[in-house]
Every structure is written in structure tokens, then in C-alpha cells.
Amino acid sequence: MVDSKKRPGKDLDRIDRNILNELQKDGRISNVELSKRVGLSPTPCLERVRRLERQGFIQGYTALLNPHYLDASLLVFVEITLNRGAPDVFEQFNAAVQKLEEIQECHLVSGDFDYLLKTRVPDMSAYRKLLGETLLRLPGVNDTRTYVVMEEVKQSNRLVIKTR
């Protein structure tokens, strides 16, 4: 995790920011096309991309898959409240949830509950099984609340990167 006090992004120049914006739009863009879009020749552009990778600004490249084609069309968010009386309950929960492939995201949050999970499953029957056989049995789980998504209005992984 990056120390937020250091704010490494403040040292990026306009070209670095443009490179990151273009790669967010299309991670498969060729270096030649990327260099044209950001106003560099190919070699310095590739050197900048490699530097951004080394420095951790670019963590990897991935394909965006259509969940409806892959038997994962039901999107569910789950609030988890832990039994805070148990020792090391947060660490145990964190370790256990890391092993669950069905959980796409797990966030420790402030508020009336402890964690917000995002999961995708084929249907409600599969979710009921996941909840009853897995989530409720995770270390320290005291309570859950389920929110089934009826419609995905907006979905994006893009970060806002100001080009100044």
C-alpha cells in the first residue's frame, strides 16, 4: 500500500498522465499508437510506460469480461458485521476472504458495519449457497445484509487523472 502522505502521483508530468489515461481507455493499444496520442516518439514513450510500471503506477493489464456470458450475471453486495469480541477477528476474516474466488472485492469500511463485499454468482440459488455455506461461516461473522443489484447503471475501473 502506498503512503498517502507521499502522494507519488504529484510528480507525474502531463505526458505521464496522458499515457495513463490512454492506457486506461485501451490497455492493448500499441506503443506506436500510444506515442502518437501523447505526442512522443515510440522509444521515449515505451521508456515512460516501463518506468510507470516499475514505479507501481501501472499494476498490470487485464481483459474486461462479460459476466452475462460467463455464468456470473447476478451481482450482489454484502454488508458484513464482525463479532468484535473475538481476538484477531479482523486479521482472521481478511485472511479467509482472500481465499474466496467468488468475492471480487472486499472493503473494510467505517459506519454501521465492518466490510462491504462484492460478489458475482450465476443466480440466487448460487448466492444462497455461498451465503449459507461460506460467508456466514467466515471467522467472526456476526451479521450480514444482502443487496441484489437489479441493474448496473454505471461500471468503471477508470481513475480520474487530471492532466493539468
From Swiss-Prot:
Q: Which CDD domains match?
A: HTH_ARSR
Domain of life the protein comes from: Bacteria
Q: What is this protein called?
A: Leucine-responsive regulatory protein
The record's DNA-binding region positions are 31-50
* GO-annotated cellular components: cytosol
Q: Which SUPFAM superfamilies match?
A: Dimeric alpha+beta barrel (SSF54909), Winged helix' DNA-binding domain (SSF46785)
GO biological process assignments: alanine catabolic process; regulation of DNA-templated transcription; response to L-leucine
Q: Which residues form the HTH asnC-type domain?
A: 12-73
What is the source species?
Answer: Salmonella typhimurium (strain LT2 / SGSC1412 / ATCC 700720)
Keywords in UniProt for this one?
A: Activator, DNA-binding, Transcription, Transcription regulation
NCBIfam families in the record, alphabetically?
A: PRK11169.1
Q: What is this protein's function? A: Mediates a global response to leucine. Exogenous leucine affects the expression of a number of different operons; lrp mediates this effect for at least some of these operons. For example it is regulator of the branched-chain amino acid transport genes.
- What Pfam families does the record point to? AsnC_trans_reg, HTH_24
List the Gene Ontology MF annotations in alphabetical order: sequence-specific DNA binding
Under the subunit heading, UniProt states:
Homodimer.
